Regions:
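Flexible "cap/lid" loop of the alpha/beta hydrolase fold
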Residues: 1-22
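Conserved strand-to-helix beginnings and helix N-cap segments that scaffold or border functional pockets
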Residues: 8, 97-101, 125-129
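Short helix-adjacent coil turns
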Residues: 17-30, 126
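Conserved alpha/beta-hydrolase catalytic His-Asp/Glu region
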Residues: 24-65, 72
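Conserved serine/cysteine hydrolase catalytic core
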Residues: 50-106, 112-115
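Catalytic active-site module of serine/aspartate enzymes centered on a nucleophile-bearing elbow/loop
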Residues: 109-145
Length: 145
């Protein structure tokens, strides 16, 4: 498996309290995951409608996290990917997510790594034009700028 235990530990330090708070019935348990990805205060800064949706769907997110963790693809599996791949990360993303992007880029043959400066984990909502342009470039087969 492609591993980076230092950065992987960052995810574990978030998911433990997240799962515990959710199990205790804490309505704001999702703060752990949202602020992990977006930085402290991200959940509080979201519009009430978005925040309400996040709270209402926390159980689904916890199930997603608990069923997909740990996901450890082998180096051989990643190196066998034989399709054009663009790995996108935000310049302000959590260090663990930036590292995952680097590992994917290094392991998938011919993959492009694109960093969107000023963005974090929530790129589709914070940088929709940049994401749309990258998708268009990828579909058209032109290199990302």
């Amino acid at each position: 498996a492609v591993r980076d235990l230092e950065h992987y530990g960052m995810f574990e330090s978030m998911t433990g309290p997240y799962f515990t708070d959710f199990a205790r019935g804490d309505a704001d348990a999702a703060r752990h995951v949202i602020d992990f990805y977006g930085g402290p205060g991200t959940l509080d800064s979201m519009p009430p409608k978005v925040r309400s949706y996040i709270v209402a769907t926390t159980a689904v997110n916890v199930r997603d996290w608990s069923s997909g963790t740990p996901f450890e693809p082998s180096e051989a599996i990643l190196q066998s990917i034989d399709v054009p791949t663009t790995v996108v990360r935000g310049g302000n993303s959590h260090p663990g997510m930036r590292r995952i992007a680097e590992l994917l880029h290094a392991s998938i043959p011919g993959a492009q790594l694109v960093t969107i400066e000023g963005g974090s984990h929530f790129l589709p909502s914070s940088h929709p034009a940049e994401i749309a342009a990258l998708v268009r470039q990828h579909v058209d087969g032109t290199p990302a700028a």
